[in-house]
């Protein structure tokens, strides 16, 4: 199921740096993480859905690039974000 407008607004509100911030790396990573987590049950039920799997892999790659950028430019923000999202065990 796709993110609803309300869910997306709540995620943006939770991760924004300041009021009106919708495009910062933290917000983008959070949105991608929730979309990725939302697709996981779909692939358990539909293991042969390769077309959607390609979209999932694109999202994972985009999130990886954004996290690498954050790690390189703002290490403290990166550590706080991965802890908050439960990434990197």
Swiss-Prot record:
PROSITE patterns: RIBOSOMAL_S15. Pfam families: Ribosomal_S15 (PF00312). GO terms for biological process: translation. GO terms for cellular component: cytosolic small ribosomal subunit. The keyword ATP-binding does not apply. Transmembrane segments: none annotated. Keywords: Ribonucleoprotein, Ribosomal protein, RNA-binding, rRNA-binding. SMART domains: Ribosomal_S15. SUPFAM superfamilies: S15/NS1 RNA-binding domain (SSF47060). GO terms for molecular function: rRNA binding; structural constituent of ribosome. Belongs to the universal ribosomal protein uS15 family. One of the primary rRNA binding proteins, it binds directly to 16S rRNA where it helps nucleate assembly of the platform of the 30S subunit by binding and bridging several RNA helices of the 16S rRNA. Part of the 30S ribosomal subunit. Forms a bridge to the 50S subunit in the 70S ribosome, contacting the 23S rRNA. This is Small ribosomal subunit protein uS15.
